[in-house]
Amino acid sequence: MHALARVWARLEEGLIAFLLAAMTLVTFVYVVLNNLYTLLYDLADLWEGGNETLLAIGDGVLTLAQEMTWSNALTKALFAWLIFLGIAYGVRTAGHLGVDVLVKLASRPVQRVLGVIACLACLGYAGLLCVASYDWVKTLFIAGIGAEDLDHFGIRQWHIGLIVPVGFALVFIRFAEILVRILRNRQTGLGLADEAADALKLTEHEEPKA
């Protein structure tokens, strides 16, 4: 079980890294192409000897740039997947911010009770949205509508929307893991990010000024 959890954690991190890299690469290529052809045209005006060659290359680059109208739609789709995978990843790594000042003033048993209540609320929210979004994706699947600017690649709207129920299912699993840890007395709360504690750690590691 622990081995499976480690494999999934690595896969989750790999998917997030891939999505970030793909978004960056697509955007970079699109921006370069849209600026390169103007540079080639300017050089063609300045260099008479290579005028025809530079114009031909510029025309080719311009054609590629015009054909990349799908880049914006793809970037948005990748970003949507990144968001919902990132929500579950944030729950696992305690990356989400929360206000728990009053909770920390309570005794440890009370903190555990409040943690269970908060965890159950999060489970209910994630479960509700998972079921609702599943029905939505099912409707998109039946309709078979192509994704805007991506339909010529065979990408349908339900392909992009599929991450919504999947993402909330992952969030549900992560909060279920937290609930188990709370009930086993291995954790008291949701494990939210603590900016104050992080700032103190950074201060402690700073070298003393001369």
Curated annotation (Swiss-Prot):
It comes from the Bacteria. Disruption phenotype: The dctA-dctPQM double mutant shows no growth on malate and fumarate and residual growth on succinate. The chain crosses the membrane at residues 13-33, 77-97, 113-133, 160-180. Keywords: Cell inner membrane, Cell membrane, Membrane, Transmembrane, Transmembrane helix, Transport. GO terms for molecular function: transmembrane transporter activity. The keyword Transport applies. Pfam families: DctQ. Induction: Expression is maximal in early exponential growth phase and declines with cell density to reach a plateau in the stationary growth phase. Induced by the C(4)-dicarboxylates succinate, fumarate and malate. Positively regulated by RpoN and the DctB/DctD two-component system. Negatively regulated by DctA. GO terms for biological process: C4-dicarboxylate transport. It is a multi-pass membrane protein. InterPro entries: DctQ, TRAP_DctQ. One of its GO terms (cellular component) is plasma membrane. Disulfide bonds: none annotated. It is found in: Cell inner membrane. Belongs to the TRAP transporter small permease family. PANTHER family: 2,3-DIKETO-L-GULONATE TRAP TRANSPORTER SMALL PERMEASE PROTEIN YIAM. Part of the tripartite ATP-independent periplasmic (TRAP) transport system DctPQM involved in C4-dicarboxylates uptake. The complex comprises the extracytoplasmic solute receptor protein DctP, and the two transmembrane proteins DctQ and DctM. The DctPQM carrier is more efficient than the DctA carrier for the utilization of succinate at micromolar concentrations, whereas DctA is the major transporter at millimolar concentrations. This is C4-dicarboxylate TRAP transporter small permease protein DctQ. It comes from Pseudomonas aeruginosa (strain ATCC 15692 / DSM 22644 / CIP 104116 / JCM 14847 / LMG 12228 / 1C / PRS 101 / PAO1). The lineage of its organism: Bacteria, Pseudomonadati, Pseudomonadota, Gammaproteobacteria, Pseudomonadales.
